[in-house]
From Swiss-Prot:
CDD domains assigned to the protein according to its UniProt record, in alphabetical order: OAT_like
Pathway annotation: Porphyrin-containing compound metabolism; protoporphyrin-IX biosynthesis; 5-aminolevulinate from L-glutamyl-tRNA(Glu): step 2/2
Matching PANTHER family: GLUTAMATE-1-SEMIALDEHYDE 2,1-AMINOMUTASE (PTHR43713), GLUTAMATE-1-SEMIALDEHYDE 2,1-AMINOMUTASE 1, CHLOROPLASTIC-RELATED (PTHR43713:SF3)
Quaternary structure annotation from Swiss-Prot or TrEMBL: Homodimer.
Main location as per UniProt: cytoplasm
The protein's name: Glutamate-1-semialdehyde 2,1-aminomutase
Keyword Hydrolase listed: no
Alphabetically ordered keywords of this record: Cytoplasm, Isomerase, Porphyrin biosynthesis, Pyridoxal phosphate
Catalytic activity entry: (S)-4-amino-5-oxopentanoate = 5-aminolevulinate
Molecular functions (GO terms): glutamate-1-semialdehyde 2,1-aminomutase activity; pyridoxal phosphate binding; transaminase activity
Source organism of the structure: Clavibacter sepedonicus
UniProt entry tagged with the keyword Cytoplasm: yes
Compartment(s) of residence: Cytoplasm
């Protein structure tokens, strides 16, 4: 028995399923989860001393790699001053200033820069950020209905688990038990990338719709970017009907571009360009905390000022703006310069090419989806129009992934334990770590090709 197996058995005695987040249980790939005990640079090490190239990277935050010395020192220095005060600290303002300044695209032809985040409220988790954004949208508009897209994951609050991605997709769940029908009925789910469905919903329910929430680029059902012009038209439909557009950048924010996916999608576009769009509210997580629990919601000042203590929409949190966590986030964002984003894109380019080569040589049918440095693969022949929505993602040959995953794991590469999750590279990936992944791919591709569907 491995030490990981022994530790996992102990965990199952006192923790439901042995994990504190379902996807970690290896439910869709089988086998025993590795108990990780150490991480540095592009590597993680398990309780048995086995080292892996990490393509999970804490599900997104570790864009610099693990245990970056400057981040570790910032955390140590902050902890030495106190783990928490229950009061506002200067670093919270610094982080809010950094985000409001960073989330911008340069003006075109002399027009001013576009800056959608005028004010920011810090929370501890992405779920809190999206939950609060929904409450704020309802409080600001005085309306009750919410529109979301099938396969988009916005955390595990009651309003947002309907036809969600991430662990809900991994476990093949329709949503979650424990959500009253009255709450579920306030969320309208439509197919992603389907503007006709959006227009139909607004035609029927427009005066009651508080907001449309969308992942800036879907990354929790695999990576599925919006079709060209989709989000811009979505914003127009929402605004024409007096509703708000909420862009969920918990996963994409500060990972795919210095200004998140909004920056990637709007860079170089004038404000009046047909494909330009500006959200009313944005949610952040992952990278903004540098690996510690920080998330945020931001947006238009007139909307944000409806939050207490200025307005009637209540939100609070004992650990919101925790000084140690904020120190990690501040330092990570300050270090995430153009060289970091260049390194992320290069690593993604190399790995995508290597996977495609291995899959082609193994005779696999597949599709690759990408948003900046985020990418994923689906097994099976894609439809002619490509992978554009939850239905096409779910139709893939998911049964090939466990064989692929375990072959990579056995060769020292840690991938997300679900075909519905993105691969995360880090700027710490060097020639040696990339080479280990590349050398592992041919055998893993052959294992996937040899897999058979369950009886």
């Amino acid at each position: 028995m491995t030490h990981s197996q022994d530790l996992f058995d102990r965990a199952r005695d006192v923790i439901p399923g042995g994990v504190n987040s379902p996807v970690r249980a290896f439910g869709s790939v089988g086998g025993t989860p590795r108990m990780m005990v150490r991480a540095a640079g592009p590597y993680v090490t398990d309780a048995d001393g086995v080292e892996y190239v990490d393509l999970v990277n804490s599900w997104g935050p570790a864009i610099l790699g693990h245990a970056r010395p400057e981040v570790v020192k910032a955390v140590q220095d902050a902890a030495a001053l106190g783990l928490g005060f229950g009061a506002t600290t200067p670093a919270e303002t610094e982080l809010a200033e950094l985000v409001t300044e960073r989330v911008r695209v340069a003006g075109v032809d002399g027009s001013p820069d576009r800056r959608p985040v005028e004010k920011l409220r810090l929370v501890s988790t992405g779920t809190e950020a999206t939950m609060t954004a929904i409450r704020l949208a309802r409080g600001f508009t005085g309306r009750d209905l919410l529109v979301k897209f099938a396969g988009h994951y916005h955390g595990h609050s009651d309003s947002l688990l309907a036809e969600a991605g991430s662990g809900v997709a991994t476990l093949a769940l329709p949503g979650s038990a424990g959500i009253p029908e009255a709450i579920a009925a306030q969320t309208i789910v439509v197919p992603y990338n389907d503007l006709g469905a959006v227009r139909a919903v607004f035609a029927e329910h427009g005066p009651r719709i508080a907001a449309v929430i969308t992942e800036a680029a879907a990354a929790n059902m695999g990576v599925v970017p919006p079709l060209p012009g989709f989000t811009a038209e979505l914003a127009r439909i929402a605004h024409d009907n007096g509703s708000l557009l909420i862009s969920d950048e918990v996963l994409t924010g500060f990972r795919v571009h210095p200004a998140g996916y909004w920056g990637l999608d709007n860079d170089g576009l004038a404000a009046d360009h047909p494909d330009a769009w500006t959200p009313d509210l944005v949610t952040y997580g992952k990278v903004i905390g540098g690996g510690l629990p920080v998330a945020a919601l931001g947006g238009r000042a007139d909307v944000m000022d409806h939050l207490a203590p200025l307005g009637p929409v209540y939100q609070a949190g004992t650990l919101s703006g925790n000084p140690v966590a904020v120190a990690a986030g501040l330092t990570t964002l300050r270090l995430a310069d153009a060289d970091v984003y260049r390194a992320l894109d290069i690593a993604a380019d190399i790995l995508i090419y290597a996977v495609e080569l291995a899959f082609d040589r193994a005779g696999l049918a597949y599709s690759v989806q990408r948003a900046g440095s985020l990418f994923s693969f689906t097994f099976g022949t894609p439809p002619e129009h490509g992978i554009t929505d939850y239905a096409t993602v779910q139709a893939q040959e998911t049964w090939r992934y466990p064989a692929f995953f375990h072959s990579m794991l056995d060769q020292g590469v840690s991938l997300p334990p679900s075909v519905f999750e993105a691969w995360f590279v880090s700027a710490a990936m060097d020639e040696a770590s990339l080479d280990r992944v590349i050398r592992a791919l041919p055998a893993a591709a052959r294992a996937a090709a040899a897999a058979t569907p369950p009886a």
